[in-house]
Amino acid sequence: MFSKHDQIRGYDDELLAAMDAEEARQEDHLELIASENYTSKRVMQAQGSGLTNKYAEGYPGKRYYGGCEHVDKVERLAIDRARQLFGADYANVQPHSGSSANAAVYLALLNAGDTILGMSLAHGGHLTHGAKVSSSGKLYNAVQYGLDTATGLIDYDEVERLAVEHKPKMIVAGFSAYSKTLDFPRFRAIADKVGALLFVDMAHVAGLVAAGLYPNPIPFADVVTTTTHKTLRGPRGGLILARANEEIEKKLNSAVFPGAQGGPLMHVIAAKAVCFKEALEPGFKDYQAQVIRNAKAMAEVFIGRGYDVVSGGTDNHLMLISLVRQGLTGKEADAALGRVGITVNKNAVPNDPQSPFVTSGIRIGTPAITTRGLQEAQSRELAGWICDILDHLGDADVEAKVATQVAGLCADFPVYR
């Protein structure tokens, strides 16, 4: 029999030590991975609740198990809040991740072998947009578009040319490392020209969209997916949204369950509901506006210090920095910055001469540092420290100085006060 007073401490101290070390790392490092953020303690409370015990295959009011009357209310709250937040008619809150949400969209609306047109992973797209190593590139005939090498921007004329040539059943708009604003009306026009469905993966910018600071794809897309973490600051999970379309809604629901998943994670759905409520608060827009201001401030410093920011700057929360001119690799930069308490991720740049395990760039995002409370002044300072490390790669004295500066900034701006 379990006790309500059971604790990990004293029972599994080996595991607890690793958990505590990770929490300490989050407090003592400046997190600049664009896809990472910190959740509120409310979100964590929901994920650690008794809802983790409940199986609830099916949908509210149509479950395959009894005893679902309370979790039905939880899921309906999450659905209603998601619809309100994004102005959608339909929301499915059950996908376990963004990738599983994307897989469900393909399963719902495509047949194996159908052609999809998505952004190349090498140019800032995502694995699930047709990369050959992904199921999206194995099950479907994936054609890829990319950036204009001269401007660093999506070449919409090339997207249209590829669409006319290959006649895709679905066009995928979305990215994992693109710092400019997507032209959803142009994507819609291209899709209509060739009779394709338009699928938008807004995982990286969902928080900006919710705040009204980035164009909302809902009016233009046939279906939209997102993660619920990243800029939304919720639990790790997925979400599918759409305008009213009974046929598509039915296909999407069936693709998620029973097509791709079994029982939903009700404790995570509760945490999603909390996250959506937080995002509906007036202060959420202020937070997202600061995310963008911080990103722009950092990009200005990098450009001023002679670093190439792909696409020439940023309109959102992230930037991709090419290190080709400096003769550095992303792997080297990632490791050096990690030694001083700054966490980034190595990332391929367009036409990258290095392998995906080495790369010639780093991706930087501001959602997490903005959650800590950093503003433009601290963001510029931080960008300068990054340049100092990269300008003097491997210099122990520079690393020691920056590590001290990072520790001071972390102490001044704790994640949880």
Curated annotation (Swiss-Prot):
InterPro entries reported in the protein's UniProt record: PyrdxlP-dep_Trfase, PyrdxlP-dep_Trfase_major, PyrdxlP-dep_Trfase_small, Ser_HO-MeTrfase, Ser_HO-MeTrfase-like, Ser_HO-MeTrfase_PLP_BS, SHMT-like_dom
PROSITE patterns, sorted: SHMT (PS00096)
Any Gene Ontology CC annotation: cytosol
EC top class, as a word: transferase
Annotated site (Plays an important role in substrate specificity): H229
Gene3D superfamilies for this protein: Aspartate Aminotransferase, domain 1, Type I PLP-dependent aspartate aminotransferase-like (Major domain)
Superkingdom of source: Bacteria
Swiss-Prot/TrEMBL keywords: Amino-acid biosynthesis, Cytoplasm, One-carbon metabolism, Pyridoxal phosphate, Transferase
Modified residues (N6-(pyridoxal phosphate)lysine): K230
Pathways involved: One-carbon metabolism; tetrahydrofolate interconversion; Amino-acid biosynthesis; glycine biosynthesis; glycine from L-serine: step 1/1
GO molecular function: glycine hydroxymethyltransferase activity; pyridoxal phosphate binding
Pfam families according to UniProt: SHMT
Catalytic activity, EC: 2.1.2.1
Obligatory cofactor(s): pyridoxal 5'-phosphate
Keyword Transferase: yes
Catalytic activity: (6R)-5,10-methylene-5,6,7,8-tetrahydrofolate + glycine + H2O = (6S)-5,6,7,8-tetrahydrofolate + L-serine
Protein location: Cytoplasm
GO BP: any one term: tetrahydrofolate interconversion
Residue numbers binding (6S)-5,6,7,8-tetrahydrofolate: L121, G125, H126, L127, S355, P356, F357
Known role: Catalyzes the reversible interconversion of serine and glycine with tetrahydrofolate (THF) serving as the one-carbon carrier. This reaction serves as the major source of one-carbon groups required for the biosynthesis of purines, thymidylate, methionine, and other important biomolecules. Also exhibits THF-independent aldolase activity toward beta-hydroxyamino acids, producing glycine and aldehydes, via a retro-aldol mechanism.
Family named by the database record: Belongs to the SHMT family.
Subunit and partners: Homodimer.
Protein name: Serine hydroxymethyltransferase 1
Source organism (scientific name): Pseudomonas aeruginosa (strain ATCC 15692 / DSM 22644 / CIP 104116 / JCM 14847 / LMG 12228 / 1C / PRS 101 / PAO1)
